[in-house]
Amino acid sequence: MREYLNFLKYIKENGVLKNDRTGTGTRSIFGYQMRFDLQKGFPLVTTKKIHIPSVVHELLWFLSGSTNIKYLNDNNVRIWNEWATVDGELGPIYGKQWRDFNGQGIDQIADVIQMLKTNPNSRRILVLAWNPCVVPSEKISPQENVVKGNSALPPCHAMFQFYVANNKLSCMLTQRSADAFLGVPFNIASYSLLTHMVAQQCNLDVGELIWSGGDCHIYNNHIEQVNEQLSREPLALPTLKILRKSNSIFDYKYEDFEFENYNHHPAIKAKISV
């Protein structure tokens, strides 16, 4: 994934120093796009190890509509624990907005599947996670926001849109805030997996994943890790096999996915900014 390394290098060389909500500070650019042909391999970063179970379980959790971390923790995925209440609640985050937007019974995922099957040329096949009604206040903690009925965190990956051409399904992800080192490789993998799943449900081939970022940043405490990653040579991409076609987009299980030939460099540890 040379495209991703070029992205890191561009931020490192062109980013401006900015303060941020977490107090860590960033090197930041505004506006960047990467394109990945899903026919040429699954875009899983190889210059460090990506924890595949976290990618898969989080996506299945989103699709379930759940906003409690119990399912994740039961599967040894703890990427959301920092922001949850003692009861494991995160408020109306991604899953809630995807499956029941604003609590109004609007199942955006079911709607896009239906549109792809019946009107694939529509320009309205998109899903919003950004809901201004529940954006949390920066003046109080994530947990306090949840108590007030807001989400613990605002969605970083705010919108995605599907597009069909030549019987191929492409997805464009719009990410308002992009943690280039920790978050973006994970997001690319997650939405690539989702595109494969939706394509299978709609009897389509996969096309491209287009990743578009707004505020793209490297945290100041990730510079050393970025330099380490940039020193590594990318390896061949793995391939994804979906072992069965489930009855619906909501019925897939972790065991349905197999990532073949995922060869990678060692993991690079970095602290997440809370």
Curated annotation (Swiss-Prot):
Which pathway is recorded for this entry? Pyrimidine metabolism; dTTP biosynthesis
Q: Which InterPro entries match?
A: Thymidate_synth/dCMP_Mease (IPR045097), Thymidate_synth/dCMP_Mease_dom (IPR023451), Thymidate_synth/dCMP_Mease_sf (IPR036926), Thymidylate_synthase (IPR000398)
> Could you cite one Gene Ontology molecular function of this protein?
thymidylate synthase activity
What keywords is this UniProt entry annotated with? Cytoplasm, Methyltransferase, Nucleotide biosynthesis, Transferase
Binding-site residues, dUMP: 21, 123-124, 176-179, 187, 217-219
Q: Which residues form the signal peptide?
A: none
- Which Cys-Cys disulphide bridges does the record give? none
Q: Which reaction does it catalyse?
A: dUMP + (6R)-5,10-methylene-5,6,7,8-tetrahydrofolate = 7,8-dihydrofolate + dTMP
Give the active-site positions.
Answer: 156
Lineage, top-rank taxon, reads Bacteria
Q: Name one GO cellular component term.
A: cytosol
Residues the record lists as binding (6R)-5,10-methylene-5,6,7,8-tetrahydrofolate: 51, 179, 273
Question: Where does it localize?
Answer: Cytoplasm
Q: Kind of enzyme, top EC level?
A: transferase
Q: Do you know which CDD domains this protein is assigned to?
A: TS_Pyrimidine_HMase
Q: Name one GO biological process term.
A: dTMP biosynthetic process
Documented EC number(s): 2.1.1.45
Q: Fetch the SUPFAM superfamilies from UniProt.
A: Thymidylate synthase/dCMP hydroxymethylase
Task: Give the protein's function.
Answer: Catalyzes the reductive methylation of 2'-deoxyuridine-5'-monophosphate (dUMP) to 2'-deoxythymidine-5'-monophosphate (dTMP) while utilizing 5,10-methylenetetrahydrofolate (mTHF) as the methyl donor and reductant in the reaction, yielding dihydrofolate (DHF) as a by-product. This enzymatic reaction provides an intracellular de novo source of dTMP, an essential precursor for DNA biosynthesis.
Q: Which family does it belong to?
A: Belongs to the thymidylate synthase family. Bacterial-type ThyA subfamily.
Subunit structure as annotated in this protein's UniProt entry = Homodimer.
| Record's protein name | Thymidylate synthase
Please give the organism. Answer: Francisella tularensis subsp. holarctica (strain LVS)
